[in-house]
Amino acid sequence: MIKIPKIGFVSLGCPKNLVDSERIITKLKAEGYDLVDSYDNADMVIVNTCGFLNSAIDESLEVIGEAIAENGKVLVTGCLGNKADLIKEKHSEVLSITGPQDYENLIEAVHTHAPIFVNDFVSLVPPQGIKLTPRHYSYLKISEGCNNTCTFCIIPDIRGKLKSRSIDNIMKEAEKLKNAGVKELLVISQDTSAYGVDIKYKSGIWNDKEYQSNILDLATALGDLDMWTRLHYVYPYPHVDKIVPLMAQGKILPYLDVPLQHSSPEVLKRMKRPAHTQKTLDRINKWRDICPDITIRSTFIVGFPGETEADFEHLLDFAEKAQLDRVGCFKYSEVEGAKANQFDNLISEEVKQQRLDEFMGLQAQISADKLQRFVGTEQQVIIDVINKDENYAIGRTKYDAPEVDGQVIIGDALERNLKVGEFATVEITESTEYDLIAD
């Protein structure tokens, strides 16, 4: 009897890395490998690493060590794979190291260390591939790499320059996901609004219609699928204004994830980010004029080298004026290889924490005030979790992305016959700083 090798798999890092993991697992399943969820049952373990922040590097190295201790046969891939010397220094027992999207060499290493002799299993893989997210939503990665030169970031060094997929290729995947039961698409890349620049917006055919490989045509085509479509990592370029009418028309969700990072022109210049604060505020107001329903999410960094008290006050003032709906904030930390590491005037950890607390305290109040408007209204939600023991469900409105935004806590889930992955209409009875409650 032929023994089918069993592969353990650990996926670390961001949603883009999760998509890479899905592609690797799909390839392994197509060749007949079994995927298992524990180290001790596996013949070998693959760790798909993150190598962006120092904390992510530490986590990746720790997980690699755990896999070696528990299993002994470990392959490493992903962003940290670009630092093979570091991995070998810490864990010389690692069998193979490959970088991000280096699927061919990773699979070759799997063949070497866990050979398989039965490889006609393509029919066992669903058309949409293997997904690691819940069945009802999926990340849709439209490009790799980035052409920006932000001083705090090393993504171009890790993943290379922008490499966009053709629009017809993306739409074929999106259609497969819909046919598989996916109801929400989360469009991701390093810079979604730059999609297609590198391939000169080349045209493609989908459903007998010609589209250009640009973000407007892509959003238009995705809107025709009649799914929840959510755009992430969108820089506030002028052409984004053309997408917002699609949100007002209900074609795609009224949601934009715009990573602004700061508001102070001086800080933004040091970050090598767009530094036109008033233009950004004007653009946000324009979006709200076009689509009053729009939810704008952003992320910020406090404590960047050289950030003065005046710079931080500028950020607080911007938060008051912008009234953003969803906000995340991080203390600046060095990333090995980033240009910002050479900057002077470092901010102490104590000051970073104080600024983080003050900024998020302000944003919590803004969020609480904005969520109050939902009390007494009916909202459509998609159900993510059912807790049968305590008889409640967790869902999300169209204004909230999974994992990073707020939730709707719904009582009497069993009596309502709520089901994970299905839509329901609920009445909002309370709101908190970040979440809504429905009875």
From Swiss-Prot:
SUPFAM superfamilies documented for this protein: Radical SAM enzymes
Key words, A-Z: 4Fe-4S, Cytoplasm, Iron, Iron-sulfur, Metal-binding, S-adenosyl-L-methionine, Transferase
Plastid found in the keyword field: no
Residues in TRAM domain copies: 372-439
EC annotation from Swiss-Prot or TrEMBL: 2.8.4.4
Residue ranges that the Swiss-Prot or TrEMBL entry lists as coiled coil: none
Pfam families attached to this UniProt entry: Radical_SAM (PF04055), TRAM_2 (PF18693), UPF0004 (PF00919)
Required co-factors: [4Fe-4S] cluster
Signal peptide boundaries: none
Cofactor binding, note field: Binds 2 [4Fe-4S] clusters. One cluster is coordinated with 3 cysteines and an exchangeable S-adenosyl-L-methionine.
GO biological process, one term: tRNA modification
Reaction(s) catalysed by this chain's protein: L-aspartate(89)-[ribosomal protein uS12]-hydrogen + (sulfur carrier)-SH + AH2 + 2 S-adenosyl-L-methionine = 3-methylsulfanyl-L-aspartate(89)-[ribosomal protein uS12]-hydrogen + (sulfur carrier)-H + 5'-deoxyadenosine + L-methionine + A + S-adenosyl-L-homocysteine + 2 H(+)
Radical SAM core domain mapped to chain residues: 132-369
Family per record: Belongs to the methylthiotransferase family. RimO subfamily.
The protein's name: Ribosomal protein uS12 methylthiotransferase RimO
Species for this entry: Francisella philomiragia subsp. philomiragia (strain ATCC 25017 / CCUG 19701 / FSC 153 / O#319-036)
Lineage, highest ranks first: Bacteria, Pseudomonadati, Pseudomonadota, Gammaproteobacteria, Thiotrichales
